[in-house]
């Protein structure tokens, strides 16, 4: 049996190691690109969601005070999106359904917006006509605003409403959609929305909207997992057999290295932070002391719920962004409990003044992607989002002062992609069950709290005229790589 930490052999990260004609021999490996509804569609012809309210009412929560009302205008330009995908030679497109576009009130009782259904039918049909497989995320953080008010910001159970919403999608699109992702990064919504207040609804212990950073993130995360479980159970009972699809979820994928690799406290801290921020999103706690650490603040699953949750993945998606150093930090006083400090770990990007990896909008050490993949050795994995570092931050006003040619010549992204694909090649050759690689993102888009200041993507977009889209060097390289 292979060890989940077996990847000790030297990784060859030369650029030419990932451009060979036959990159892997594994059958049914999928290359794709990804987006999400709020980040690309625009707000036209749908009801408000929590991000609409949040960015309009509190623009200071976004780094450039921008809003996602237009974004890439994919609602009107979806055929252009598909043309980009076709030009890139990808076999799949991961996108999300905007909950408020199909259920304006968030609930079936509030009525179905057939125009929204038509939009997604058109998108799915266009993808299929071009030989591109749709991978659909059911929920990517955009709770309908009317629904959010009624359920008190996800702090009350919403399983039946989410299940009904998911069933609507299974009914209307399941004849063509064969890959369903219930939730995108449940950890992020729970922590950013209820731990530090940076995402809607902006709740935390010290936030003006109120909240409790020591309890609410765990309640929300618990409800997210139960909603996932209910949707999976429904799909398997009523739809999977005759529709022939698969269903899973997506976690934020991070790896942690002890700041001092000879210090036992730092070693334990790295393991514990992984447990909190990655495994915690699956309902799994591998260190019993963590349950003791959280006590009654951690909601409990019934034995039946635990059993259903344990078997609720046909595949697991990982969004890999970052590697960080971890060092021991004493736990907070009982009166200062917070999801941000409960793990008793301080994380950072530098050791003795040296960055852990490439300095960009994110920091990464590419070899640690291999460790992350190894950890989930016996699960079918889809690497659903690898954020390609932005060469620079560029506010849309500043773009008038820069040459578009510089933005398009993103050679750093090419090396980033190449290094990650080299690691995946090693992992697959050693038996890791990695079934796909999806680059984030198809095109420059609205990056939630960062607004339009970051460009992670393989196609340049003019945010004042989203029909103006231009292929970057990384997009051309990715296209050639897939075609070989």
Curated annotation (Swiss-Prot):
Annotated residues for binding of a beta-D-glucoside = 39, 140, 184-185, 321, 440, 447-448, 456
Any single biological process term in GO: carbohydrate metabolic process
The similarity comment for this entry is: Belongs to the glycosyl hydrolase 1 family.
Tell me the keywords, alphabetical order: Disulfide bond, Glycoprotein, Glycosidase, Hydrolase
Q: Which cysteines are joined by disulfide bonds?
A: 204-207
Q: What is this protein called?
A: Putative myrosinase 6
Q: What is its EC number?
A: 3.2.1.147
**Where is it found, in Gene Ontology cellular component terms?**
mitochondrion
Q: What is the lineage of its organism?
A: Eukaryota, Viridiplantae, Streptophyta, Embryophyta, Tracheophyta
Question: For this protein, what reaction is catalysed?
Answer: a thioglucoside + H2O = a sugar + a thiol
Q: Which InterPro entries match?
A: Glyco_hydro_1, Glyco_hydro_1_N_CS, Glycoside_hydrolase_SF
What is the native source organism of this protein?
Arabidopsis thaliana
**Record's Gene3D superfamilies?**
Glycosidases (3.20.20.80)
Q: Which GO terms describe its molecular function?
A: beta-glucosidase activity; thioglucosidase activity
| Carbohydrate attachment residues | 28, 260, 462
């Amino acid at each position: 049996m292979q060890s989940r930490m077996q990847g000790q052999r030297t990784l060859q990260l030369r650029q030419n190691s990932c451009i060979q004609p036959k990159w892997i021999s594994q059958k049914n490996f999928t290359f794709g690109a990804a987006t999400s509804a709020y980040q690309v569609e625009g707000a036209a012809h749908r009801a408000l969601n929590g991000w609409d309210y949040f960015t309009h009412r509190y623009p200071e929560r976004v780094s450039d005070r921008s809003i996602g009302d237009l974004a890439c205008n994919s609602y009107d330009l979806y055929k252009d999106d598909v043309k980009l995908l076709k030009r890139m030679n990808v076999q799949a497109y991961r996108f999300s359904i905007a909950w408020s576009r199909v259920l304006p009130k968030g609930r079936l009782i509030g009525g179905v917006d057939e125009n929204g259904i038509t939009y997604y039918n058109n998108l799915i049909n266009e993808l299929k006509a071009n030989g591109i497989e749709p991978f659909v995320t059911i929920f990517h953080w955009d709770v309908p605003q009317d629904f959010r008010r009624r359920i008190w910001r996800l702090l009350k159970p919403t399983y039946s409403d989410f299940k009904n919403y998911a069933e609507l999608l299974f009914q209307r699109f399941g004849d063509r959609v064969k890959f369903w992702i219930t939730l995108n990064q449940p950890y992020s919504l729970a922590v950013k929305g209820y731990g530090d207040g940076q995402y809607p609804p902006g709740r935390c212990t010290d936030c003006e909207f109120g909240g409790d950073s020591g309890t609410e993130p765990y309640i929300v995360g618990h409800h997210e997992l139960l909603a996932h479980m209910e949707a999976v159970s429904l799909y398997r009972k009523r739809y999977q057999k005759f529709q022939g699809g698969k269903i899973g979820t997506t976690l934020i994928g991070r790896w942690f290295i002890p700041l001092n690799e000879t210090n036992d406290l730092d070693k334990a801290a790295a393991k514990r932070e992984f447990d909190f921020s990655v495994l915690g999103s699956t309902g799994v706690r591998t260190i019993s002391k963590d349950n003791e650490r959280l006590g009654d603040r951690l909601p409990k699953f019934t034995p039946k719920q635990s059993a259903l949750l344990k078997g609720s993945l046909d595949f697991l998606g990982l969004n890999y962004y970052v590697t960080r150093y971890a060092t021991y930090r004493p736990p907070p006083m009982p009166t200062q409990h917070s999801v941000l400090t409960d793990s008793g770990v301080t994380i950072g990007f530098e050791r003795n003044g040296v960055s852990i990896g490439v300095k960009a909008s994110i920091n990464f050490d590419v070899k640690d992607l291999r460790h992350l993949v190894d950890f989930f050795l016996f699960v079918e994995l889809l690497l659903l989002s690898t954020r390609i570092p932005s060469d620079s931050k560029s506010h849309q006003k500043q773009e008038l002062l820069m040459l578009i040619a510089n933005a398009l010549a993103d050679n750093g992204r090419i090396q980033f992609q190449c290094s990650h694909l080299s690691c995946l090649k090693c992992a697959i050759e050693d038996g890791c069950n990695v079934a796909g690689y999806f680059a984030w993102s198809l095109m420059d888009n609205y990056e939630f709290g960062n607004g339009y200041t970051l460009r992670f993507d393989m196609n340049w977009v003019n945010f004042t005229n989203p029909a103006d889209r231009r292929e970057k060097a990384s997009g051309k390289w990715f296209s050639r790589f897939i075609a070989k």
